[in-house]
Amino acid sequence: LFGVNYLSNQPQRALRYNKRFMGDRRYMSFWSWLTTGNFVNKEFSYYKVPMELDVFDQEAFADSGVPFYVVTTDIETGKPDYIKIDHVFEQMEALRASSALPLVSEIVEYKGKRYMDGGLSDSLPIDFMENLGFDKLIVVLTRPKGYRKEPSKTSKRIYKLFYCKYPEFVDVASNRHIHYNKSIEKIEALEKTGNLYAIRPAHALEVGRLEKDPEKFEAIYQEGLEQMRNEMSHLKTFLGDN
């Protein structure tokens, strides 16, 4: 969901509303999880915040002219679906589905299909972007160079317990490390050929997926800004923008 702010040209918006609301149990909390089935609250986080409390600029998003896609995992097939977002407010359920983490989120229904987090089936959609015709790719990673995911000894048992009706989903979610590591290998290969520019942190980030410490968010944000100030000339060279 953060990515839409690039196209709406609203820098610091994601940082601002996360710092403002991360301590609010209506935003994300175990209270929300127990009462609604979603750790990240559907109504407050995905509707009230962007529509009323920190308004997302849909007009600027549309005027950007840049195609924007989200990746979701079809829970019936275990396959990724790539959904083009033309109107953020009208397609909020697709955005929500793309980040619906297993166990702490309900399955999201969108246009007759049932979805969960797209990162389970295609964490790094390199092949999809190449198939769209892009010959130069920029990938933003959250892990340092050399990182590889390790298999989890317990994840398959847990997924089988909670998603026993969806064996294809259980299989792809349990083997996420395999798909992720293959994508990283492809990224590194494309870097060597000059077809891909990877932006990655210099070290492991001390922040969790459901992080609620505003100081950690601020520190990582500032670190990212400083890194890109140092890297911008290299990125422009890669793009041929001299």
What are these regions (language model features)?
Residues 152-173:
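Acidic, Ser/Thr-rich peripheral helices and adjacent loops at domain boundaries
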Residues 55, 122-123, 184, 214:
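Structural motif corresponding to alpha-helix initiation and N-cap regions
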Residues 1-50, 84, 89-97, 141, ...:
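Patatin-like phospholipase
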Residues 40-63, 177-182, 186, 198:
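C-terminal domain-closing interface element
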Residues 169-179, 210-211:
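Short, glycine/charged-rich beta-strand-loop motifs at protein surfaces that mediate ligand recognition
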Residues 7-9, 155-158, 214-217:
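Short, hinge-like loop/turn segments at secondary-structure boundaries
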Residues 183-242:
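C-terminal helical/tail subdomains of lipid-metabolizing enzymes
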Residues 62-140, 145-156:
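Active-site gating loop/helix substructures
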